Structure formats: structure tokens, C-alpha cells
């Protein structure tokens, strides 16, 4: 049976690639390219020797697109990396190439620029159209793989660290990582002391961490957070919110250390307000952490779904400019620095459970040492010790100190006026039965007094919010919010809040005297 030109060239490519892979040492790209062209030319010449005039084939002078795709798929480690746990749509997966050397050694890079760089080793002047065609071929034929999800395995700069056994293993294409820390794991790392001749001070990272808070529990959890940002396979299910209304408190310097641990290009800087915006989440694809040391004052988050999904590792849609959107599960940890607590529309307990507030109460104004951030935290021996310390700790959950729990409760009230209202008012109520209409009128006046503007929340929404929070007040219940209830004598006591908030509609309708005690009894 007569063979086509494409079939002949394909067979010549397969033979040359197989010969290359059989060699003790893989030939260079130029050698592989040359052997394929030689095989192809020989096959074409043989065909042309017996072909009739006008039916002869053109002798190839450079590789065809499908030949380059074949080389890429068989000489290099090319894989289609699934970005979610679903296997339904290969079009939403990322094409990655395993890097056997260079700064990305041991991980799969999904950058088109890196794939193009390798393709140009076989055809220097590959066109945009040819590159896109090659990518389509590889997407169809590349094996599909899953990102490594073993929570004990961590990709550091010089290998894969097993957190459980505390051992360093070599990289392998079978363990699919798309990112790694830029810091080596050094089992001999020590906490070095750095002396500054100019001001006569000595500095070491252990002592410096202790200066960030007088609360030992806070220092401990800060070390745990440093570890969390390089352990992306652990489902922490929380995001860290480092909070202080004043500057010069160490937050920014600590973030600089985090970035040194993760490495340039391996963290995303997405402020809270951008999680609901289009095209702002694409940096997550190649990141293992989100580190933001500045959020706008007065930030209001209307749509928190993406933020919650990123924190919990649920699937989100990532819209990419000029590319097809993909479904993506972010694996990593988030740190956001705040100078003011953000207001979020989502006031559910499921959202609050994801928040780890860490108050920074120290102030280093007048005692700043900029060289800590600009010099010390960039030194190899310093970051290698930090890496060594956090990888030799033993934890899969955070040890949350009381001060952080208190900060979260304060934030809940700050973010939710109804919660704050109930915390203040419920213990003060005198009546044993409180109509929702009374509580709503009281809330509106309280809101004007303490928030300073008119509340627009409707009665129905208010009732819903109250019922959601009522579980925090075991002395109160509401079996059926829609059922009419006769108060009988449950409203006979004086309700002093009527007078305090001047609820004119709730003063007694039968008593006309000046006795306050009688005027605030409902009749």
C-alpha cells in the first residue's frame, strides 16, 4: 500500500527519536534534529528515486510542526495537568513541561514562553501559528496527570521534603509540582548571629521573631504561618489577617521574609477587593501562596465566594486574558495585611471560621532598622535556617492563641452591626417576651446612635439575622417566628431601653403621668 508523505516523515521521526532514547546519554537537541532530518531526507530520496516525474516529494529542509510536537512529547516530559479533581474537560487542564535543570528544576512549568523556548531548540524560527498548532497536538496526545496532593510532601529548591519523615528526596517527574520554594533545605542550617559594625547591634532571626509580639502564643503561630506558606498541600482552611491600625509594627518585614521563602514568581499579590474582579485571579495558577502587605483602608467585599473558595481549596473559575477560562483549585495559604478591618457582605459562620486574625500591637517607630528587611532577611544562611526550623516543627493545624480568638470576635461585631447590637442589648432586655417589631425599632435607633447613619436593612432581613445569631443566647428562643404569641404578663416589667432610645411608639398608651417606671411598661 502506498504511503503518504506525512506517514513517511512521521516514521522517520519515530525511528530517530527511538534511536536517541536508546543512547546511554541523550543526544543534544541539534543532534536529534539533525538525525530526524537525515532520516526524513533519506526516506524522501528513496521514494523520489522510483517516483514518476511530477510525483516526486519535496526534500525537507526543516522540521514540520507535528515532528516538533512528537519530539516534545517523547524526549521531554510533557503532561496535561488537571487543575481540579474532575476529569471531565481536558480543555481546562494546563499543559506543562517538566524542567530537568535550571531554576525550575523538578517542577512542571505551564508558561507558554518556556514551552516555546524548548520548541525553538528544534526550529529556531517557529511562527506563532506553528506554535499554536504544536500546542494543540500536544494537548491531544499528552498524558493527563494530577498535581501532587500528598500533604506531607513539599517542593523545596533542592528536592522534595517529606514532612513526616524529615527526609529530602530527589525530584521526579512522577511527583507533579507546578511550583516550589526557592530556598534549599539544609539539614545543617544554624541560627546565625549577624553583627552590625555601624550601630553595634547583634541580630538573629529567632530573637527578631520574639520582638514581634509580647504574647508567646502569637510568636508561635507566626512561625507556623511561615511554615504554612511553603506547605501548599495541607488544607489549612484559614487565611491569616495580620492587623494593626498603626505602622512600623513588623507586618511588612515579616511579609518580606515570607516572599524570600516562597521565591519570586511563586506568590500572588491579590488584595481582598480584587477577588471578585475578572482576570485578577490568573496569578494563582503558578502560585503557592498569596502575600499582600497592603490593603486599601475602607475595603468592602461585596462578593466573597472566590475568596472563600481560595481559602478552602474549592474550585473557582479563572478567567485568563486571550485564553480559555479554566476551573482551578488553588493549593496554598493566604496572608493579608490590614490597617483597618474590612467589611464583608458575607456574615456567615462558615466565612468567619476561615479567618485567623493576628493583632500586631508593637510599634517600632524611631527604632526602625531597615537593613533587616533590605539585607538580613535576604541572606541565604538566614532563610535556610527559617526553612529548616519550620520544616522540623510538627503540626498540621494552627495553635490559635486567645488573643487571636478575641480579635476574631471583635471583628465579627465590627463587620456585623446586628451581632454587635445583640451583644450589647440582649443582656439589658427586661421583658421576657420581645416582639421583633420592638427589637427592630430599637435596632434602628441604636444604629443611628453608634454607626451614625440611617440603617437600610429591612425588617425581614433583620429578623433573619437575629434568628441566625439567637443560638448564642441560650436564655432566649424563638420556636416559630411566624406564629402569633400572646405576651400575657411577659411584658409587664419596665423596659428601660424604651426611654434610653426614645422609642415613642412603645411608651405606655394608658399612663399619662411623669412616673418613668410606669411609662415604659407596655399596656
What are these regions (language model features)?
Residues 107-122:
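Trp- and S/T/G-rich repeat-edge/linker motifs of beta-rich repeat architectures
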Residues 2-93, 121-523:
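Feature primarily recognizes SF3-like P-loop helicase cores of small DNA viruses
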Residues 91-108, 159-161:
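Short beta-strand segments and strand-loop junctions that repeat across beta-rich extracellular domains
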Amino acid at each position: 500500500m502506498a504511503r503518504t508523505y506525512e506517514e513517511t516523515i512521521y516514521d522517520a521521526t519515530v525511528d530517530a527519536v527511538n534511536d536517541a532514547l536508546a543512547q546511554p546519554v541523550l543526544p543534544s537537541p541539534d543532534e536529534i534534529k539533525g538525525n530526524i532530518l537525515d532520516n526524513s531526507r533519506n526516506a524522501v530520496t528513496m521514494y523520489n528515486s522510483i517516483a514518476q516525474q511530477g510525483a516526486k516529494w519535496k526534500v525537507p529542509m526543516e522540521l514540520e510542526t507535528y515532528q516538533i510536537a512528537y519530539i516534545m512529547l517523547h524526549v521531554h516530559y510533557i503532561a496535561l495537568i488537571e487543575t481540579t479533581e474532575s476529569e471531565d474537560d481536558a480543555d481546562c487542564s494546563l499543559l506543562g513541561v517538566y524542567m530537568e535543570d535550571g531554576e525550575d528544576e523538578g517542577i512542571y512549568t505551564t508558561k507558554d514562553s518556556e514551552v516555546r523556548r524548548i520548541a525553538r531548540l528544534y526550529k529556531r524560527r517557529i511562527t506563532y501559528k506553528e506554535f499554536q498548532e504544536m500546542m494543540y497536538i500536544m494537548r491531544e496526545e499528552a498524558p493527563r496527570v494530577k498535581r501532587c496532593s500528598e500533604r506531607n510532601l513539599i517542593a523545596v529548591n533542592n528536592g522534595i521534603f517529606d514532612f513526616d519523615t524529615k527526609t529530602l528526596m530527589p525530584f521526579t517527574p512522577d511527583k507533579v509540582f507546578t511550583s516550589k520554594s526557592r530556598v534549599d533545605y539544609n539539614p545543617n542550617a544554624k541560627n546565625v548571629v549577624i553583627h552590625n559594625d555601624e550601630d553595634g547591634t547583634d541580630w538573629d532571626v529567632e530573637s527578631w521573631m520574639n520582638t514581634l509580639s509580647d504574647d508567646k502564643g502569637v510568636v508561635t503561630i507566626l512561625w507556623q504561618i511561615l511554615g504554612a506558606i511553603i506547605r501548599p498541600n495541607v488544607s489549612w482552611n484559614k487565611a491569616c489577617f495580620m492587623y494593626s491600625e498603626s505602622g512600623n509594627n513588623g507586618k511588612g518585614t515579616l511579609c518580606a521574609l515570607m516572599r524570600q521563602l516562597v521565591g519570586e514568581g511563586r506568590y500572588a499579590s491579590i488584595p481582598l477587593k480584587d477577588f471578585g474582579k475578572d482576570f485578577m485571579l490568573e496569578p494563582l495558577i503558578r502560585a503557592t501562596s498569596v502575600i499582600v502587605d497592603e490593603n486599601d483602608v475602607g475595603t468592602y467585599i461585596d462578593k466573597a465566594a472566590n475568596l472563600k473558595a481560595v481559602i478552602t481549596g474549592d474550585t473557582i473559575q479563572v478567567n485568563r486574558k486571550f485564553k480559555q477560562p479554566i476551573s482551578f483549585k488553588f493549593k496554598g495559604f493566604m496572608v493579608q495585611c490590614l490597617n483597618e478591618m474590612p467589611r464583608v457582605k458575607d456574615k456567615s459562620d462558615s466565612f468567619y471560621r476561615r479567618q485567623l486574625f493576628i493583632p500586631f500591637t508593637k510599634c517600632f517607630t524611631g527604632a526602625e532598622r531597615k537593613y533587616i528587611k533590605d539585607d538580613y532577611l535576604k541572606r541565604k544562611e538566614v532563610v535556610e535556617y527559617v526553612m529548616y526550623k519550620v520544616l522540623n516543627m510538627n503540626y498540621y493545624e494552627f495553635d490559635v492563641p486567645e488573643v487571636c480568638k478575641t480579635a476574631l470576635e471583635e471583628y465579627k461585631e465590627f463587620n456585623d452591626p446586628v451581632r454587635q447590637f445583640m451583644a450589647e442589648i440582649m443582656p439589658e432586655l427586661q421583658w421576657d417576651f420581645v416582639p421583633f417589631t420592638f427589637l427592630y425599632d430599637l435596632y434602628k435607633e441604636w444604629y443611628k446612635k453608634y454607626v451614625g447613619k440611617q440603617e437600610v436593612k429591612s425588617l425581614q432581613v433583620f429578623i433573619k439575622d437575629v434568628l441566625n445569631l439567637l443560638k448564642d443566647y441560650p436564655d432566649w428562643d424563638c420556636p416559630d417566628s411566624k406564629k402569633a404569641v400572646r405576651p400575657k404578663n411577659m411584658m409587664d416589667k419596665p423596659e428601660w431601653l424604651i426611654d434610653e432610645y426614645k422609642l415613642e411608639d412603645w411608651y405606655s398608651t394608658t399612663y399619662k403621668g411623669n412616673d418613668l417606671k410606669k411609662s415604659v411598661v407596655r399596656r
